[in-house]
Curated annotation (Swiss-Prot):
SMART domains named in the record: HAMP, HBM, MA
Transmembrane region(s): 18-38, 287-307
Topology relative to the membrane: Multi-pass membrane protein
Database matches in InterPro entries: HAMP_dom (IPR003660), HBM (IPR032255), MCPsignal_dom (IPR004089)
Gene Ontology, cellular component aspect: plasma membrane
Domain HBM span(s) in chain numbering: 45-282
A Pfam family that the UniProt record links to this protein: HBM
Record organism: Pseudomonas putida (strain ATCC 47054 / DSM 6125 / CFBP 8728 / NCIMB 11950 / KT2440)
Compartments it resides in: Cell membrane
Top-level taxon: Bacteria
This protein's UniProt keywords: Cell membrane, Chemotaxis, Membrane, Methylation, Transducer, Transmembrane, Transmembrane helix
CDD domains associated with the record: HAMP, MCP_signal
Protein name according to UniProt: Methyl-accepting chemotaxis protein McpQ
Length: 638
């Protein structure tokens, strides 16, 4: 059986083997998953049902609390809460009827639905009984008020008639009415059935006295008393109706309590039942999962063992064959009996072994030829290396000479450039000096012109000074004559006595003015004389300055001519320096180009030398490798 299975699997591809193994594992995993899924689904369903049952229990508790609140308060708010709780419970029970499949729990739900129906009926009866009770309470109030009002009127009438005895009978009846009313009020507020008989007895006693009262009072009060008796009869009937309504309310409330207990018990029983079903489903799910897991492990281990043997054994055979090839043994061949990927691998190993036999045989012959060729190449390479080394030495000498020449050319170019710069600077300075000399000539010529103008102005000033002197002579003569006239006038005034005193004063003033004028004229004459003397000296100096200025203009013109000659000479020097610098730069460029070419030749020589050395080294290495290959090829057994 195993041989047939091994042979069948040996012809199946590894891809299908692995697919079969992993597919089986995946199918088993899927089976376990479906089993767990089914168990979890069942448990979740039971949990949901338990949750819904707990909701029924919650609504039942809320219904009980609402019923207790309504029993204590009897108001609209508590009534609305009770109706809401009952509606929620009925809706939840109807919902659960479509979810429960177990007959026992379904029967319990039917029981709960019936209990809800009875509870609703009892609740309706409770509301009707409460309505009748409240109506009876209203009748009690109106009947009692009417009877008391009628008795009060009779009392007031009897009191006004001063019928004391009759009034006392009416007061006694009124007291009995109040007593009966008090008993009824106690009964209606307490709701105790024992108080009902006490209240009825009090009403009957008051009613008997009320009916006997018309015989004790005037006949005019008989109608009022009859109406009061009728009202008290209605009062008694209302008490009876109140008692009946109270009894019906208590009975309905008791039925509600009983049905609430039924609802709660049914919910508890359903909770216990569903819990048992859930636990059973959980146990069943655990059992199924355990069985499925054990089966999956067994089948998985079996598949893993079979597939592993189908893969490992041929791999080990192939590995041993590869190790023989690695050790150099090419004498043996691998026998192939499979058609899967591993069989194809073994066939490839067989073909590789045969190919290696042929390859190693060919390599052995080629290695011998390589060794002899490497020895010849090594000898040629040594000769080439010696020639390249000689070329390298000569090239280094040429490169050194070119470097020295390049440095000298650079120095010449640098000196020519410096000389050109110095000539350019000298040319600029000469041009600047020529310009300054031209400006100096112009300034000196303008100065000479101004000196001539100043000399002419000084001559004119001298002429004007002479004119001022003649005018001053006239003024001086006039002042002397005025002084003489003033002196004569003073003498004549003195001769005239008192009559000429005023004229004498004027003559004195005129004489004094003439004397000051004469003194001022003399001072101006002295100033004019000094001015004329200074003007004469300045005119003499200006003549000398004009002569010197003319000499300076002539010298400056000669200096300008010399600077212009220097400028032309420096410009010529600058042009020649520029030509020298240009030639030096061209020579420098050519020298650098030659130097680069020589350096390239030297680099090529270095590269050639290095290549020759590397070729020689490679030749030696090739010879060594040939020997080594011969040794390696010798390790293989063909």
């Amino acid at each position: 059986m195993y041989q047939w299975l091994a042979q069948s699997l040996g012809n199946v591809s590894v891809n299908r083997k692995l697919g079969l193994g992993f597919g089986l594992v995946l199918l088993l995993t899927l089976a376990i998953t479906l089993t767990g899924w089914h168990g979890m689904d069942s448990i979740i369903d039971r949990g949901d049902k338990l949750g819904n049952i707990s909701v029924i229990q919650q609504y039942t508790q809320e219904l009980r609390i609402a019923r207790q609140q309504y029993d204590r308060r009897r108001d609209d708010a508590s009534l609305a809460e009770l109706e809401k709780a009952l509606s929620n419970l009925d809706r939840q029970v109807q919902l659960m009827l479509g979810q429960i499949e177990q007959p026992a729990d379904h029967q319990r739900l039917e029981q709960q639905r019936e209990a809800v129906r009875i509870y609703q009926q009892a609740f309706n009866e409770l509301k009707q009984a409460d309505q009748r009770r409240e109506a009876s309470r209203d009748v009690l109030g109106s009947s009692a008020d009417k009877a008391v009002d009628l008795i009060g009127r009779v009392q007031r009438s009897l009191l006004q008639g001063a019928n004391i005895n009759q009034y006392q009978h009416a007061v006694d009846v009124s007291a009995l009415l109040q007593q009966a009313r008090f008993q009824v009020r106690g009964y209606t507020y307490s709701g105790n059935a024992d108080y009902q008989q006490t209240a009825l007895k009090a009403i009957d006693q008051a009613l008997a006295e009320l009916r006997a009262l018309p015989a004790k009072v005037p006949a005019e009060h008989a109608a009022s008393l009859d109406d009061a008796a009728t009202a008290m009869g209605g009062y008694r009937d209302a008490v009876t109706q109140f008692g009946n309504a109270q009894l019906a309310s208590e009975q309905a409330l008791q039925r509600m309590v009983e049905q609430g207990t039924v609802l709660l018990q049914a919910s508890q029983m359903m909770t216990a039942s569903q819990t048992e079903v859930r636990d059973a489903a959980a146990a069943q799910a655990k059992t199924l999962l355990t069985v499925a897991t054990v089966l999956a492990l067994a089948l998985g281990l079996l598949a893993a063992w079979a597939i592993t043997r189908q893969i490992i054994i041929p791999l080990r055979q192939t590995l041993r064959a590869a190790e023989r090839v690695a050790s150099g043994d090419l004498t043996q061949s691998l026998q192939v009996q499979r058609r899967d990927e591993l069989g194809q691998l073994q066939a490839s190993m067989h073909r590789m072994t045969q190919g290696l036999r042929e390859l190693i045989g060919g390599i052995g012959d080629g290695v011998t030829q390589i060794a002899s060729a490497a020895e010849e190449l090594s000898a040629v390479t040594e000769q080439t290396s010696a020639g390249v080394n000689n070329q390298k030495v000569e090239t280094d000498q040429v490169a050194t000479a070119m470097n020295q020449m390049t440095a000298t050319v650079h120095e010449v170019a640098r000196n020519a450039e410096q000389a050109s710069e110095a000539a350019l600077m000298a040319d600029q300075q000469a041009r600047e000096g020529d310009r300054v000399v031209g400006e100096a000539v112009a300034q000196i010529e303008r100065l000479a012109s101004e000196v001539v103008n100043s000399s002419e102005a000084m001559n004119l000033l001298k002429t004007e000074s002479d004119k001022i002197g003649s005018v001053l002579d006239v003024i001086k003569s006039v002042a002397q004559q005025t002084n003489l006239l003033a002196l004569n006038a003073a003498i004549e005034a003195a001769r005239a006595g008192e009559a000429g005193r005023g004229f004498a004063v004027v003559a004195d003033e005129v004489r004094s003015l003439a004397q000051r004028t004469q003194q001022s004229t003399e001072e101006i004459e002295e100033l004019i004389a000094g001015l004329q003397s200074g003007t004469q000296r300045v005119a003499s100096v200006m003549d000398n300055s004009r002569q010197l200025t003319d000499s300076s203009v002539e010298l400056t013109r000669r200096a300008g001519s010399s600077l212009e000659t220097i400028t032309r000479t420096v410009s010529s020097i600058q042009a020649m320096n520029q030509q020298i610098a240009t030639a030096a730069e061209e020579q420098t460029a050519v020298a650098e180009e030659i130097n680069r070419s020589v350096m390239n030749v030297r680099d090529i020589s270095d590269q050639t030398s290095a290549a020759s050395e590397e070729t020689a080294s490679s030749s030696v290495e090739l010879a060594r490798l040939g020997t080594h290959l011969q040794g390696l090829v010798g390790r293989f057994r063909l």
